[in-house]
C-alpha cells in the first residue's frame, strides 16, 4: 500500500550539510493521490482511539497533523521553536548533537484529560518528538502516541520515546 509513497520520497545527498542524506517528502505532498493515501493511512490507524487533540511539530508536522485532526474530529494545535507563538507558553528543552533545542506550546492548547496524538514527518533521533510528548504530559494530558510518515530506524529514535505507541508509515 505504501509502495507508491515510498517511491515518491527522494534522497538528496549532502543536504542540509555534507554527509547527510535528506529524505525529501515534497513529491508526496504535491501528488494529490499519494497525499490522500498518506492521510487516509494515518486516520485508519488512529480512528479507533478517542483523540481529542492532534499536535503538529514545526514545521512539516503541521502538514499532516491538520488533516488528520480534521478527519478524526479532533482539535489541532502546534508546537514551535521558542519565540514563535504569540501567547503564554511552556517550554521543553531537548539535546541536539552539539547543544540543545527547545519547543514551546501555548499553555491553553491542551489540558488535563485530553487524549493527544503527536505528529511529525520524520522520526530521526527522537529528540524533537520526545520534547513534544513531554509537553503533553506536563499539561496533564494523556499522550496516546506518535505518528510519523517515515522513520529512520538506524537512528533508534523510537527508543527515545519511552513506552508510547509509535506508528510510522514507512521505515528506512
From Swiss-Prot:
Official protein name in the record: Adenine phosphoribosyltransferase
Alphabetic keyword roster: Cytoplasm, Glycosyltransferase, Purine salvage, Transferase
EC top class, as a word: transferase
CC per GO annotation: cytoplasm
Principal subcellular localization: cytoplasm
The encoding gene: apt
Pathway: Purine metabolism; AMP biosynthesis via salvage pathway; AMP from adenine: step 1/1
Location in the cell: Cytoplasm
E.C. number: 2.4.2.7
Amino acid at each position: 500500500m505504501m509502495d507508491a509513497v515510498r517511491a515518491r520520497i527522494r534522497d538528496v545527498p549532502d543536504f542540509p550539510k555534507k554527509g547527510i542524506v535528506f529524505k525529501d517528502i515534497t513529491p508526496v505532498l504535491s501528488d494529490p493521490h499519494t497525499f490522500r493515501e498518506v492521510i487516509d493511512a494515518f486516520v485508519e490507524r488512529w480512528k479507533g482511539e478517542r483523540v481529542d487533540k492532534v499536535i503538529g511539530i514545526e514545521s512539516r508536522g503541521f502538514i499532516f497533523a491538520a488533516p488528520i485532526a480534521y478527519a478524526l474530529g479532533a482539535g489541532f494545535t502546534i508546537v514551535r521553536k521558542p519565540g514563535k507563538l504569540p501567547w503564554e507558553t511552556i517550554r521543553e528543552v531537548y539535546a541536539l548533537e552539539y547543544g540543545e533545542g527547545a519547543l514551546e506550546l501555548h499553555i491553553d492548547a491542551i489540558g488535563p484529560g485530553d487524549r493527544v496524538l503527536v505528529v511529525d514527518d520524520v522520526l530521526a533521533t527522537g529528540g524533537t518528538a520526545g520534547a513534544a510528548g513531554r509537553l503533553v504530559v506536563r499539561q496533564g494530558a494523556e499522550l496516546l502516541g506518535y505518528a510519523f510518515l517515515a522513520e529512520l530506524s538506524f537512528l533508534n529514535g523510537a527508543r527515545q520515546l519511552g513506552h508510547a505507541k509509535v506508528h510510522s508509515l514507512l521505515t528506512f
